[in-house]
C-alpha cells in the first residue's frame, strides 16, 4: 500500500479538540501508549500518534476506493448522526446513524429481506400504489416505510456486506464492531482514552465526543475515499 500525504495538521487537530480524552479515572490502561499527558484530571491524546494512524487509515481507504470497494460508516449518537450522514453521502458510502439493529451484518439474509421490503414500499409510494389502498392498510404500510427509512435509509442501496467499516464510537457501536470481527470485515475505529485499541484493524486515537473532532477525522477519511473513487472512475 502506497503512503500518501493527507495534509494532517497537528494545530488543526488541537483547534478541533481531537486531543481531549476522558477523565483520568475513566480510562483503559491499553491506551497508555496513545496518551501524552494528564491535564486538570483529563487524559491528553498524543496527536502525533493520531496523525500517524489517521494517515494509515486514509491510505487504506484510498487504496480500497480506487479498487471499487464499498464502505459503511457507523455512528448512532444523536449529536453525530448528521455528520455521519453528510460524510457518507459526500463519499457515496453506506451509513447507519440512528440505531444499529443487532445482526445487521451477521444475519445479512434478514437484513436483505428488510431491504427488499423497503425498496418495494418506496416504489409503491412513488408510483401512487399506496394511495389506491384502503386508508387503514395504507396507513399501516406508511408506518412500516417510515420505520424502515429511519433505520435502513442509509443502507438502502447496499447489495452485500461492506468491504470496510468505519466506526465513530467504539463503546456506542460495540455490537457493530463485534459483528465485523466475527465476519472478518476490516474496521477503522475512532478510539477515545476509555477504549480498547486492539479491537479494530486501524484504531485512530481521538476525542469521540466533540463534534468538531469527529468531523475532522471523517473529513480526512471521506476526502481520501473521494480521491480513490475518482481514480477508479478514470481507470475502471
UniProtKB/Swiss-Prot annotation:
CDD domains given in the database record: RPS2
Compartments (UniProt record): Plastid, Chloroplast
* InterPro entries in UniProt: Ribosomal_uS2 (IPR001865), Ribosomal_uS2_bac/mit/plastid (IPR005706), Ribosomal_uS2_CS (IPR018130), Ribosomal_uS2_flav_dom_sf (IPR023591)
List UniProt keywords, sorted A-Z: Chloroplast, Plastid, Ribonucleoprotein, Ribosomal protein
Q: Which GO terms describe its molecular function?
A: structural constituent of ribosome
Q: Which GO terms describe its biological process?
A: translation
Report the main location listed first in the record.
plastid
Which superkingdom heads the taxonomic lineage of this protein's source?
Eukaryota
GO CC terms in record: chloroplast; small ribosomal subunit
The cysteines covalently paired via disulfide bonds are none
- Membership in a protein family: Belongs to the universal ribosomal protein uS2 family.
Q: What is this protein called?
A: Small ribosomal subunit protein uS2c
Amino acid at each position: 500500500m502506497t503512503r500518501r500525504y493527507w495534509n494532517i495538521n497537528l494545530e488543526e487537530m488541537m483547534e478541533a479538540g481531537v486531543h481531549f480524552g476522558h477523565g483520568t479515572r475513566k480510562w483503559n490502561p491499553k491506551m497508555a501508549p496513545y496518551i501524552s499527558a494528564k491535564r486538570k484530571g483529563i487524559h491528553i491524546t498524543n496527536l502525533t500518534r493520531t496523525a500517524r494512524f489517521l494517515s494509515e487509515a486514509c491510505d487504506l481507504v484510498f487504496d480500497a476506493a480506487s479498487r471499487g470497494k464499498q464502505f459503511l460508516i457507523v455512528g448512532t449518537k444523536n449529536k453525530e448522526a448528521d455528520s455521519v450522514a453528510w460524510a457518507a453521502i459526500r463519499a457515496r458510502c453506506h451509513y447507519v446513524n440512528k440505531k444499529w439493529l443487532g445482526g445487521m451484518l451477521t444475519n445479512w439474509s434478514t437484513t436483505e429481506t428488510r431491504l427488499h421490503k423497503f425498496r418495494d414500499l418506496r416504489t409503491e409510494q412513488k408510483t401512487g400504489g399506496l394511495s389506491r389502498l384502503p386508508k387503514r392498510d395504507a396507513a399501516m404500510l406508511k408506518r412500516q416505510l417510515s420505520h424502515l427509512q429511519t433505520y435502513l435509509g442509509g443502507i438502502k442501496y447496499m447489495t452485500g456486506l461492506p468491504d470496510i467499516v468505519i466506526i465513530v464510537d467504539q463503546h456506542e457501536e460495540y455490537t457493530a464492531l463485534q459483528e465485523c470481527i466475527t465476519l472478518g470485515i476490516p474496521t477503522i475505529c475512532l478510539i477515545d482514552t476509555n477504549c480498547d485499541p486492539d479491537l479494530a484493524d486501524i484504531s485512530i486515537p481521538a476525542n469521540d465526543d466533540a463534534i468538531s473532532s469527529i468531523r475532522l477525522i471523517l473529513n480526512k477519511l471521506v476526502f481520501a475515499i473521494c480521491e480513490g473513487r475518482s481514480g477508479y472512475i478514470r481507470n475502471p
